Amino acid sequence: MLEQIRGPADLQHLSTHQLRELAAEIREFLIHKVAATGGHLGPNLGVVELTLALHRVFDSPHDPIIFDTGHQAYVHKMLTGRAHEFESLRKKGGLSGYPSRSESEHDWVESSHASAALSYADGLAKAFELSGHRNRHVVAVVGDGALTGGMCWEALNNIAASGRPVIIVVNDNGRSYAPTIGGVADHLATLRLQPAYEQALQRGRDALRALPLVGKFAYRVMHSVKAGIKDSLSPQLLFTDLGLKYVGPVDGHDERAVEAALRHARGFGRPVIVHVVTRKGMGYAPAEDDEADQMHSCGVIDPITGQATKVAGPGWTATFSDALIGYARKRRDIVAITAAMPGPTGLTPFGQQFPDRLFDVGIAEQHAMTSAAGLAMGGMHPVVAIYSTFLNRAFDQIMMDVALHRLPVTMVLDRAGITGSDGASHNGMWDLSILGVVPGMRVAAPRDAARLREELGEALDVDDGPTALRFPKGDVGEDIPAIERRGSGLSGVDVLALPASGCNHDVLLIGVGAFAPMALAVARRLADQGIGVTVVDPRWVLPVSDSILELAARHKLVVTCEDNGVNGGVGSAVSAALRRAELDVPCRDVGLPQRFYEHASRGELLADLALTDQDIARRITGWVAALGSGVAEAEIREHLD
């Protein structure tokens, strides 16, 4: 049946029995396709009936359907003509794991970061009204914990006051990655409002107000009594007191019930909350039985057992997790904060060991950072573990609430650099540029597991300002020993390789963090061409160590190699430091060009960007040749470009 669905119009004449058959087929399709490619399985298994109902009630794309945390949009993609592309899900040149404007007119936004859909919906509703398109509805589907984000409540405040026809579907599965935390999660409860009930209620209000002399007074008295009763009985007042209509809760796996609720909501002609209760991982036993996160996201798995087909090696996240627990056993002041991601950021074991020292604040990165500031003011040393890409959301709090007060808060940035298959929104290529402008910020980029443990310990010993550690997704690899360390403390840099015997000190190659192994491979290639290279790991990459400047003064060329955007990264910082020190040594930066990157594997993206050891060695060879020929600096720059 799924093969016959080319678009939402093909759903309109299906019977209840056919819809049930289609839902079962969609789940089977999802399990086998996502098992083969990896992706967000649990969230999509939970929204099958909801998505069918949405596309039967609303006229997409005329009525925009916006998915917050867009990882729950797989079924939407299938129903809008893209089921045949799922073999390529999250692969280079294939189907994105999130809504994509370039794929379909049904995808209005590139949504993947949480809590933004309601603001998009508010803006679209305003635009439609100003354009005279009063017969268009805007639907925002929020869930997977998105309502724990403050941006949702800012948008709700505006939507409620507008009176515009925005339908807000709350996909209440009680979870983000792990179970949803906080008062909002506790507050999603019951009230079933039907249009007929609302119409009768309004007629009663009008009749009461019309009574001679006492009408308005009687209405106020009765309204106060009704409000008091509702306050004691109806948790949904969280929404209705904002001026939003409320429908629900509705069984999210009863397609007809969801469809009826959506049709009622559409008929109100004003902002409405439709509360839909779903089960993450619905219909797939391995997901339903996964207490950690209902298989929120998975790699390639066996579709029968749900088990990974490839055993991963030691990972960066697990290494951090073990190290933090080790330090926390020795120091009671160490606490940890997560923004709804204890599992993905490695904090679940910490919470099991120290349940009173782990704080899950929900999808609320801004609050996480300022709460960390408060903890630090109170004598704790908070560790905020967060994906690099989500750090962007808390910049003001880092600057004004943490750094301004010189508070000892440590930020651990997982998934730094190119992450790959999750696409543009998840590449952690901005953190060095962002943190580089924060006064007093110190940033480390460990090259291996041993350095991660060491640099985490150093960060925890800092008591006069914020620190950050960044590391990529995936396996951590073998430890890389240093030949020597120049300098001490946070200023100490590790020398990993020296020029071969008989070679000049031509190039100082600075390998930042996980790019250190590639820097060593580049040095070996250059040595074969008679180019002498010193490879250093700066360890604490920001601010630039005096030891780096001392080494730079002994070389003809400095090259930085980093897994970050080149604008404002380590290369920019080293160039600026060389100028301040009045060192006339040219510096070239190798990193990520400043643009958004489509989904592909990390290796594929790095190859496309000429960020392999072979490509980098070729570029450095050209730079050294240009320097050796005595060409003017401007001509060298032109040659390099």
UniProtKB/Swiss-Prot annotation:
Among InterPro entries, the record links this protein to: Dxylulose-5-P_synthase, THDP-binding, Transketo_C/PFOR_II, Transketolase-like_Pyr-bd, Transketolase_BS, Transketolase_C, Transketolase_CS
**What are the entry keywords?**
Isoprene biosynthesis, Magnesium, Metal-binding, Thiamine biosynthesis, Thiamine pyrophosphate, Transferase
User: Which organism encodes this protein?
Assistant: Mycobacterium avium (strain 104)
Any single GO molecular-function term of the entry would be: magnesium ion binding
The pathway noted for it is: Metabolic intermediate biosynthesis; 1-deoxy-D-xylulose 5-phosphate biosynthesis; 1-deoxy-D-xylulose 5-phosphate from D-glyceraldehyde 3-phosphate and pyruvate: step 1/1
Q: Which residues bind Mg(2+)?
A: 144, 173
**Partners and quaternary state?**
Homodimer.
How is the cofactor bound, in the record's words?
A: Binds 1 Mg(2+) ion per subunit. Binds 1 thiamine pyrophosphate per subunit.
What's its EC?
A: 2.2.1.7
| Family according to the record | Belongs to the transketolase family. DXPS subfamily.
What name does the UniProt record give this protein? 1-deoxy-D-xylulose-5-phosphate synthase
What is the phylogenetic placement of the source species in the record? Bacteria, Bacillati, Actinomycetota, Actinomycetes, Mycobacteriales
**PROSITE patterns reported for this sequence:** TRANSKETOLASE_1, TRANSKETOLASE_2
Cofactor(s) listed: Mg(2+); thiamine diphosphate
Annotated positions binding thiamine diphosphate:
71, 112-114, 145-146, 173, 284, 365
Q: What is one process in the GO biological process aspect for this record?
A: thiamine biosynthetic process
- Report the protein's function: Catalyzes the acyloin condensation reaction between C atoms 2 and 3 of pyruvate and glyceraldehyde 3-phosphate to yield 1-deoxy-D-xylulose-5-phosphate (DXP).
Q: Which GO cellular component terms are attached?
A: cytosol
